[in-house]
Amino acid sequence: MSDMASWQPSAPVANLLKRASILSTIRRFFSDRGVLEVDTPSMSQATVTDVHLVPFQTHFVGPGVAQGMMLYLMTSPEYHMKRLLAAGSGPIYQLCRSFRNEESGRYHNPEFTMLEWYRPHYDMYRLMNEVDDLLQQVLECESAETLSYQQAFIRHLDVDPLSADKTQLREVAAKLDLSNVADNEEDRDTLLQLLFAFGVEPHIGKERPVFVYHFPASQASLAQISTEDHRVAERFEVYYRGVELANGFHELTDAAEQRQRFEQDNRKRAAAGLPQQPIDEHLLAALEHGMPDSSGVALGVDRLIMLALSAERLSEVIAFSVDRA
C-alpha cells in the first residue's frame, strides 16, 4: 500500500452512505416495535470466560488506583444489558462497537459493530421470527429456513451429533480429509465444531438465510437447556451465503448454574494453558436478584451490511479496517 493511498478509507464513500441508511433502518425497526435503545460501557473489570474468545486488555490509572485497574474491552454488551433487564428495563437493543483480539480478514475485524437485543417473555422461536423479519427488511431476502443442529448433521454428514461417539465423529472427519486434525483431538465438542464448520456450513443458507437451532447442551454457553430434550440447548445461529450472522439464546437466568459454567470455562482455559478470566460478579448478582425470562441475540452488523451491499469483504463496508486505523 502506498503512503499516498494509506490515508484513504477502506470503504467507498457510496458504501458508507448505504451503511448509514441501513443503520437508520435498524433503529426504525426497533423504534416501531417499542424496543428501547441503550448504551452500555465499552470497558469492564470482568470479561468473558469463553475459551475461544480473546479480549483486549488495558489499565486505568487514576485516584485510588495508582497501581492500575485492569480493564477489558467488551467482546459483547451482553452482561451489561442483562443487568439492565434485571433492573426492569423491558425490551432493549444496542448498536455498539465490540472488540475481539482475533484474526483480521474477509469476515473479521478486531473492532466491529454489534447489534444485540433482548426480549423479556420471548421464547427462542419467537425471537427467531423477529430476527427473520429484520433480515427480510434489510436484505430483501426470502423468509429463513429453520433446521435443527441434529437435522443439519444427519442431512449433510449422515451422522447424529447427539449420539455419535468420538470414534464415529473421527470417521466422518476422515471422509472430509480432516484426519490430520481430528485424530489427535480428544474434545468431543471440538470435533463437532470441526465437522460443522467444514461439513455443514458450506452447504446451508445459500439461497436464503437458515436458522440452526438446538445446539448440543455442552455448547449451551449462556443459554438454557431445553426442558423437552436435555441433550440440547435453547440456542440458535443464523447463516446466509457462507456467513455466520447471528447467535441467539433463550437466556439462562439461574445464577448458580451460570457461575458453574463460568468456572468450567476457566478450568478449560487452564487445561489449555490459557489465562483464567475474572468472573463478572455484577452479572451473577443481577441474575440472583432476578432477570426476567428472556431471549436475546447478537448480530454482526458489518457482515449484515456486507451481504446487503453484495460486498466481498468487511473492509468494503467499514470506514477504516484495522490495517488503516
From Swiss-Prot:
<dbReference type="InterPro" id="IPR004364">
    <property type="entry name" value="Aa-tRNA-synt_II"/>
</dbReference>
<dbReference type="InterPro" id="IPR045864">
    <property type="entry name" value="aa-tRNA-synth_II/BPL/LPL"/>
</dbReference>
<dbReference type="InterPro" id="IPR018149">
    <property type="entry name" value="Lys-tRNA-synth_II_C"/>
</dbReference>
<dbReference type="InterPro" id="IPR004525">
    <property type="entry name" value="EpmA"/>
</dbReference>
<keyword id="KW-0547">Nucleotide-binding</keyword>
<keyword id="KW-0436">Ligase</keyword>
<dbReference type="GO" id="GO:0000049">
    <property type="term" value="F:tRNA binding"/>
</dbReference>
<comment type="function">
    <text>With EpmB is involved in the beta-lysylation step of the post-translational modification of translation elongation factor P (EF-P). Catalyzes the ATP-dependent activation of (R)-beta-lysine produced by EpmB, forming a lysyl-adenylate, from which the beta-lysyl moiety is then transferred to the epsilon-amino group of a conserved specific lysine residue in EF-P.</text>
</comment>
<feature type="binding site">
    <location>
        <begin position="76"/>
        <end position="78"/>
    </location>
    <ligand>
        <name>substrate</name>
    </ligand>
</feature>
<comment type="subunit">
    <text>Homodimer.</text>
</comment>
<keyword id="KW-0067">ATP-binding</keyword>
<feature type="binding site">
    <location>
        <position position="118"/>
    </location>
    <ligand>
        <name>substrate</name>
    </ligand>
</feature>
<dbReference type="GO" id="GO:0016880">
    <property type="term" value="F:acid-ammonia (or amide) ligase activity"/>
</dbReference>
<dbReference type="GO" id="GO:0006430">
    <property type="term" value="P:lysyl-tRNA aminoacylation"/>
</dbReference>
<dbReference type="GO" id="GO:0005829">
    <property type="term" value="C:cytosol"/>
</dbReference>
<feature type="binding site">
    <location>
        <begin position="100"/>
        <end position="102"/>
    </location>
    <ligand>
        <name>ATP</name>
    </ligand>
</feature>
<dbReference type="Pfam" id="PF00152">
    <property type="entry name" value="tRNA-synt_2"/>
</dbReference>
<comment type="similarity">
    <text>Belongs to the class-II aminoacyl-tRNA synthetase family. EpmA subfamily.</text>
</comment>
<feature type="binding site">
    <location>
        <position position="251"/>
    </location>
    <ligand>
        <name>substrate</name>
    </ligand>
</feature>
<feature type="binding site">
    <location>
        <position position="300"/>
    </location>
    <ligand>
        <name>ATP</name>
    </ligand>
</feature>
<dbReference type="InterPro" id="IPR006195">
    <property type="entry name" value="aa-tRNA-synth_II"/>
</dbReference>
<protein>
    <recommendedName>
        <fullName>Elongation factor P--(R)-beta-lysine ligase</fullName>
        <ecNumber>6.3.2.-</ecNumber>
    </recommendedName>
</protein>
<dbReference type="GO" id="GO:0004824">
    <property type="term" value="F:lysine-tRNA ligase activity"/>
</dbReference>
<dbReference type="GO" id="GO:0005524">
    <property type="term" value="F:ATP binding"/>
</dbReference>
<feature type="binding site">
    <location>
        <begin position="244"/>
        <end position="245"/>
    </location>
    <ligand>
        <name>ATP</name>
    </ligand>
</feature>
<feature type="binding site">
    <location>
        <position position="109"/>
    </location>
    <ligand>
        <name>ATP</name>
    </ligand>
</feature>
